[in-house]
Amino acid sequence: MTKTVSDVICPFCGTLCDDLEVVVSDDGKTIVDVYNACAIGAEKFMHAQAKGRVTRPRMQQPDGSYKEVSYDEAVEYTAQMFAKSKKPLMYGWSSTSCEAQSVGHEIAEKAGAIVDNTATVCHGTTLIAVQDVGIPSCTLGEVKNRADRIIFWGCNPTHAHPRHQSRYSIFPRGFFMNKGHKSRKVVVVDPRVTDTAKMADIHFQVEQGRDYELLSAFRVALRNEKLPDVVAGIPKEKIYEAAEILKSGRFGIIFFGMGVTQTLSKNHNIDEAIMLTKDLNEFTKFSIMAMRGHYNVTGSGQVLGWQFGYPFCVDLSRGFARYNPGETTSNDLLVRGEVDAVFVLGSDPGAHFPISSVKKIAQLPSVCVDPHITPTSEVSKLHVPVAFVGVEVGGNCYRMDNVPIDARKVVDPPEGVLTDQEFLTRVNKRLGELMGAA
């Protein structure tokens, strides 16, 4: 016999779907099937059962091979690394629970570390823009029930957030949107004809890197002022037409992704997008929201914010929190050789950072805490496997709209495998002993 666990939270992307049903074996140790999830979310649950999964810490040997060690040895190595380091980097935090993040920040305070999350290479520019000009936002529930004008700017949720459109933005029938897709107008701004663009009523194929110009043109068009014949590759007539469509809606939302945050102008793009949203509020109700990637990258910013006052790249090396993107961000620190140890949890910089940064990680004392074998685990001196948050252990996570949701445990982790929080708590305790002895 099997049993079904309902209302399960999906720990994949920032949409944090909360309607999954997971069928588990009678003994509660094996996942049999997953319902309501997208292909990627379902695979996250099934991958926890994968054969050959690493269940014990591995230490890199002088010849490059890995030798299995105990969790006690892993805790000792990690604590000693922090105790000896003058300026360690603690990076990641986006694929773990808020409880684990909180313990990690205690370690950072003791060790005088820099704490940075994956926003540093994706939506960090968004956070800078919000600090500049504020943000008129809302929840995804409001979007589902009220929004009749949807803009996807520089993002492709069909692939990056597969259930976003069916649960919240385009297709669902909401309280005031009882015809679903037919009740809405969808605008996509993207240089490429993506699968999201194919669903749009209007697709602006903007020239690469010229989003700032088009955002400014929309602000001009809202006031019926003059525009050049072509802006960023878009005829002015099309811009005026879209501006009227946006003004005529009852409630609108701009969803934006890394096509805006990591192209030319960076945070200034977001400044302009937020100001466009504020301008639209002179005519109708409009909000704006970042399409956050990892399922708890938003939570990492929240926990850092309420503990230290800044959402990412927090430098605690002087005994108090400092924040200066460009100086205290991970890649800048690694490339300049300013850190002497690296601790990675809930992220994979080995796959996504520039090779110059990855080489530095490989040369330094380093620890990677991850359930998977990843490019980062293969260049780190120590790999510590842990339980999957949202599958084998519960914990608090924040959805992309800053709504906290409790992930739930579905099955038990493999015997003897620690959770992120348990491992960090043991490291924190041992580090306290070492620092006290010093």
Model regions and ranges:
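Generic beta-strand/beta-sheet core signal
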Residues: 25, 91, 189, 255-257, ...
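Active-site phosphate/pyrophosphate-binding segments
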Residues: 210-214, 225-323
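Peripheral docking tails and interdomain loops at the edges
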Residues: 383, 389-390, 416-435
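Short, highly selective alpha-helical patches that border small-molecule cofactor pockets
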Residues: 100-104, 108, 215, 269, ...
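N-terminal export/assembly segments and adjacent metallocofactor-ligating motifs
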Residues: 1-211, 216-221, 233, 258, ...
